[in-house]
């Protein structure tokens, strides 16, 4: 059912049947370390490049999710996946052995939200019994692609965020579980003209604000109708900006807001500056922390809003602004 300007409410809500998370060593040392399904001994995952390591994480996450659901790849109708690298090579190489029909997606760090939205639409529309969603990011591969090789040892400003080395995989289907996707709000591109690639939180906060408000308008809800409103990776800088933007529009989500980039690392002892980011940040946190809280009934309804800064090395070097996008996924206990 179409809701408002940008949202869909599902009459037959798809379920998140199972999920899995794979992360690197630093993430395993953070507050959620014991909750992840797999923590690498180092960030190479037995490979000889950062990019291959990221593909290995995706492969492991998919296999773990399928194993936990007692399924084979043949039970999946379509795969929706993405990462931060050029042409989505981490995903292509990571899932090729599964031989599942695939949609390769790019929404920067919002890709997990985009993928979950599309997968749930397909299931709700009857185009398949089960879909597989997977996204990933890697600190080493992202730094090499968008900033500087690690061996360069450049200084990072305090507004910079630490790209999470991690992957999350989710099986979205018709079989009942304790978490269902009851609706989605598809985000718009929001551009405030910012150009600082070392301050991604500021670039993404306006898009998060836009989607959160639109979700409440489309579904005719208030902040208190959600136990948590969870953004993907605004970090400490972006969260502060989000609160200011929401306040200007007479909304207050302070008491209910959580950010995956602020949750996955311990700011006081891990020196990640403004927090975590990356396609794997929201995905791994969703699998390891958010879904269990919903499944247990601790949270009854959550608005999950992965956020992305839409830039490339070319657009940045040509002086283009960095617009943001955010997709809202309504998750409910059942």
Model-found features: residue ranges?
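Short, well-ordered amphipathic alpha-helical segments that serve as non-catalytic structural scaffolds
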Residues: 54-70, 116-118, 203-218, 285-290
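Conserved beta-ketoacyl condensing-enzyme motif
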Residues: 16, 50-109, 225-240
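A generic, well-ordered mixed alpha/beta core segment in the N-terminal half of proteins
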Residues: 92-144, 148-159
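Short glycine/threonine-rich loop-to-helix capping motif typified by GTGT followed
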Residues: 92-95, 234-249, 314-321
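Condensing-enzyme catalytic core mediating Claisen C-C bond formation in acyl metabolism
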Residues: 1-51, 149-213, 218-221, 252-271, ...
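Active-site-proximal alpha-helical scaffold in enzymes
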Residues: 105-133, 170-172, 277-299
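Short, well-ordered, mixed-charge alpha-helical segments that flank or form enzyme active sites
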Residues: 88-89, 139-144, 189-193, 311-313
